[in-house]
Amino acid sequence: MVVYNFKQQFVPLIEMGAKQQTIRSPRKRHTQPGEAMQLYTGMRTKACRKLITPDPLCLSVEPLLMHDAWGIKLNDHWLTRDALTRLALADGFAAWDECLRFFSTVHGLPFEGVLIKWATNR
């Protein structure tokens, strides 16, 4: 089982089920479709807590490239402006521009990673 930590700004959206995806940097092992995932906030602190019980199941893991001039390439296809907006909203941002600023600041651009989607068992 793979564990993911989330910044506080995303916690309410995850807990109410509005955010059911995450964009992540490459790592040794990501969750795989069909696997249970554990979602936490505050890991490695006294404020650590699990966000969803029972554990959600991974639906998909898709390769992603984010570029400041071209947008997002998902599974070898560049997203339209409308699709960028939908992806940003689903990921917990108010708009595509906010999502782009966040990744530019936190990770730098261009950014290569994965889009992970899950389903809750509520």
What are these regions (language model features)?
Residues 1-122:
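Catalytic phosphate/metal-binding cores of nucleic-acid and nucleotide-processing enzymes, i.e., regions
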